[in-house]
């Protein structure tokens, strides 16, 4: 990590018809020989398919159906070891990239390979966790990040809260361990859309210790927006210093923003009391109160980049937050 790249925030995410049988077949081959060859082909094809499916299913864990609330639970199995495990030049720290997600598959196909290459060039040990919300409630980015924190393995010691539609382009951006305090990679001076001083969204790095100190994020924010503003107040309330990049000269060209609002509109509705509640600090809820279950955990490779997809069912207290329901 280069100290010069961080500053404290100043305040007030052969032939196409290839032969099917070894050695080919003569034109005058008997029907009996053709039949035997066909049976052999079917047998070996089924054998290959069985072995292939067995290998894939070994990567999928299903049936984790019991509801989970808060952190008093053992961490899930480790992700597959990456190539840097025995290379000390990658450093001692390992990053869990937490990606809240719903239905943006075209963005995910770009994000995972890009981030894996970007972090690998910077020699950052990492694993990408895609937190796919599969329930019927409105999208809850903050609760998904809480789930990602709890479900990421013990081998990671810091997290990146990372939007799937925000890609870093400048190689000088620092994704190293944020020992001094939370590090806001997508600072207001660099983010292509959001420029207010208290903004901490897009991409934010925290040590797991500091995230616990904040009690994670509030689970009350259903729909798009405002959860980051509440988390900023949690950071300050925990007595943590927020840091941002310094010496980056690419301005608003520092990131590529994938989201197309004309194609995929955001859920920005404010229903009933949500209009007032969105500006309050949730002093009781957070990491310790998130309720969910993981329906499945799948190890994938997208464009050669490894990641883990968790299908997450969030739970909503409709009395406390009736705005979790569409309409």
From Swiss-Prot:
Q: Where does UDP-alpha-D-galactose bind?
A: 100-104, 139-141, 164-165, 194, 224, 257-259, 266
GO BP: any one term: supramolecular fiber organization
| Residues with attached carbohydrate | 154
Write out the GO cellular component annotations.
Golgi apparatus; Golgi cisterna membrane; membrane
Q: Give the span(s) annotated as Disordered.
A: 61-88
Q: Which Pfam families match?
A: Glyco_transf_7C, Glyco_transf_7N
Q: What class of enzyme is it?
A: transferase
Enumerate the residues binding N-acetyl-D-glucosamine. 226-229
Role description = Required for the biosynthesis of the tetrasaccharide linkage region of proteoglycans, especially for small proteoglycans in skin fibroblasts.
**Any idea what this protein is called?**
Beta-1,4-galactosyltransferase 7
Q: Which source organism does the UniProt entry give?
A: Mus musculus
């Amino acid at each position: 990590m280069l100290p010069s790249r961080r500053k404290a925030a100043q305040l007030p995410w052969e032939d196409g018809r290839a032969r099917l049988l070894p050695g080919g077949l003569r034109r005058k081959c008997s029907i009996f020989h053709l039949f035997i060859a066909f049976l052999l082909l079917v047998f070996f094809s089924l054998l290959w398919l069985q072995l292939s499916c067995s290998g894939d299913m070994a990567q999928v864990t299903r049936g984790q159906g019991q509801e989970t609330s808060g952190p008093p639970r053992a961490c899930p199995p480790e992700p597959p070891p990456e190539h840097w495990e025995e290379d000390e030049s990658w450093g001692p720290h390992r990053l869990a990239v937490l990606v809240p997600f719903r239905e943006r598959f075209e963005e995910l196909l770009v994000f995972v390979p890009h981030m894996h290459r970007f972090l690998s060039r910077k020699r950052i040990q990492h694993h990408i966790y895609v937190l796919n919300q599969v329930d019927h409630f409105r999208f809850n980015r903050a609760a998904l990040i809480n789930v990602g924190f709890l479900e990421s393995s013990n081998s990671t010691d810091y997290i990146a809260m990372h939007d799937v539609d925000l890609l870093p382009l400048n190689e000088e951006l620092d994704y190293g361990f944020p020992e001094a305090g939370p590090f806001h990679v997508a600072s207001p001076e660099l983010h292509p859309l959001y420029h207010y001083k208290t903004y901490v969204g897009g991409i934010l790095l925290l040590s797991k210790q500091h995230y616990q100190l904040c009690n994670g994020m509030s689970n009350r924010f259903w729909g798009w927006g405002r959860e980051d503003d509440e988390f900023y107040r949690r950071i300050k309330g925990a007595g943590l210093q927020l840091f941002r990049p310094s010496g980056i000269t690419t301005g608003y060209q520092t990131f590529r923003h994938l989201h197309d609002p004309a194609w995929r509109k955001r859920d920005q509705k404010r229903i009933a009391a949500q209009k007032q509640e969105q500006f309050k600090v949730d002093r009781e809820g957070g990491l310790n109160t998130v309720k969910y279950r993981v329906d499945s955990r799948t190890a994938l490779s997208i464009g050669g980049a490894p990641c883990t997809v968790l299908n997450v069912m969030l739970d909503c207290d409709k009395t406390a937050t009736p705005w979790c329901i569409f309409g």
